[in-house]
């Protein structure tokens, strides 16, 4: 599937804003699955964007070969471990094996960081970038297939920047990568700056702000390439989900490295 954004071979140190309200839902080869892909790389299984399940749609049995994080913006998904509910983040890890069903129309804000495998006898559905057939066996049957996090109940932590609080959703411990996923609460009349130490991405959950004078609102993605100098202004407050692949340089510690 053709994405909206393709990362350059070397960082251009740019900041890109994508207004998903302006993007049409794109059908996949599997009925009932729709996407708005910001990034979509089938070779590496990398994805950033929105995924929509129509009511009654199943993902099919599959196994994650790395981290996938999904915020439930609307609806819910259920597998053998139970549901991931509205406004929770479901975290899949290397070896997560499950079949998820939507009992209601569901929208996910998703970031995939590795390919997903389906058993040879199974159908590959259109829900995952980098899907391929391979032998699938759950080698850790006592481990749940996902970690479900009620992110709004997490403690708020200071970031060292006045007007910005952090809720640490996932620190990637034990995954072999040193990334972070957080929620940032930005108070009205707040302004701050940082330099992205590595790829850093945001989804605007609510409120208004600007990134390098580019206005953003609810359901916008922001991609900050490595080395980008980023100026954030929020006169009215903003709530952000963020994924950082490395620590930023700046006055504080936004992402909890």
Q: What is each PLM-predicted segment?
A:
Residues 35-37, 48-52, 69, 89-91, ...:
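Conserved hydrophobic/aromatic beta-strand scaffold that supports enzyme active sites
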């Amino acid at each position: 599937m053709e994405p909206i954004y393709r990362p350059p071979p070397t960082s251009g140190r740019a900041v890109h804003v994508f207004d998903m309200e302006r993007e049409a839902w794109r059908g996949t080869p599997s009925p009932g699955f729709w996407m708005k892909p910001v990034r979509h790389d089938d070779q590496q299984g990398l994805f950033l964007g929105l995924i929509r399940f129509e009511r009654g749609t199943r993902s099919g049995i599959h196994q994650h070969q790395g981290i996938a994080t999904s915020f439930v913006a609307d609806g819910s998904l259920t597998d053998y471990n139970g549901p991931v509910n509205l406004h929770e983040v479901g975290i899949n890890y290397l070896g997560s094996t499950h079949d998820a069903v939507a009992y209601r129309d569901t929208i996910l804000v998703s970031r995939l960081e590795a390919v997903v495998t389906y058993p040879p006898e199974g159908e590959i559905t259109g829900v995952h970038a980098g899907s391929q057939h391979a032998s699938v066996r759950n080698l850790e049957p006592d481990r749940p297939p996902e970690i479900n996090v009620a992110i709004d109940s997490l403690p708020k932590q200071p970031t060292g920047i006045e007007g910005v609080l952090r809720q640490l959703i996932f620190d990637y411990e034990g995954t072999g990568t040193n990334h972070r996923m957080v929620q940032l609460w930005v108070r009205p009349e707040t302004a701050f700056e940082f330099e992205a130490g590595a790829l850093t991405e945001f989804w605007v959950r609510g409120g208004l702000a600007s990134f390098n004078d580019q206005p953003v609102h609810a359901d916008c993605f922001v991609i900050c390439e490595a080395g980008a100098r980023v100026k954030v202004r929020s006169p009215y407050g903003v709530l952000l989900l963020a994924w950082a692949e490395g620590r930023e340089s700046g006055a504080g510690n936004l992402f909890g490295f």
